[in-house]
From Swiss-Prot:
Organism: Acinetobacter baylyi (strain ATCC 33305 / BD413 / ADP1)
Protein's name according to its UniProt entry: Large ribosomal subunit protein uL15
Gene giving rise to this polypeptide: rplO
Assembly with partners or alone: Part of the 50S ribosomal subunit.
HAMAP family linked: Ribosomal_uL15
Sorted UniProt keywords: Ribonucleoprotein, Ribosomal protein, RNA-binding, rRNA-binding
Known role: Binds to the 23S rRNA.
GO biological processes: translation
Family as reported in the entry's similarity comment: Belongs to the universal ribosomal protein uL15 family.
């Protein structure tokens, strides 16, 4: 017997039918449909919003705000060392990274981190590097220009 993709089916009894709520007492979930009797949770759009604690001041309102989101970090792309291999040519700059679709067009800065391996020598211009990434590029015969 050969198995064909169009003949695949779950085993007999493996799948259970969906519960049809409010369809008679014989179904076991008729009338109130498993919602109990009255109350907010029994209504159509019943339930409380996320974070609601029954009327007491919620934790997100009791605790102070702190910190901030750096706008520079939002515009800085993190580039893996292995992604530099996608760049055509010897020079790696923000423009060449964008041209190779390694960095999004709206990014203003890029930072190369040590992840993966570099297969050829590159000259890195105007891109920040971690110490490990810089050592790996120089070990592969490349150089870093600020």
């Amino acid at each position: 017997m050969t198995l064909r993709l169009n003949e695949l089916a779950p085993a007999e009894g493996a799948k259970r039918d969906n519960r049809r709520l409010g369809r008679g007492i014989g179904s076991g979930v008729g009338k109130t449909g498993g919602r109990g009797v009255k109350g907010q949770k029994s209504r159509k759009s019943g339930g409380v919003r996320p974070g609601f604690e029954g009327g007491q001041t919620a934790i997100y309102r009791r605790l102070p705000k702190f910190g901030f989101t750096s706008q520079i970090a939002l515009k800085t792309a993190e580039v893996r060392l292995s992604e530099l291999n996608k760049v055509e040519g010897e020079i790696v700059s923000l423009e060449t990274l964008k041209a190779a679709n390694v960095v999004r067009r709206d990014q203003v800065r890029a930072r190369v981190v040590l992840s993966g391996e570099v297969t050829r020598a590159f000259t890195v211009q105007g891109v920040a590097l971690t110490k490990g990434a810089q050592a790996a590029i120089e070990a592969a015969g490349g150089k870093v220009e600020e």
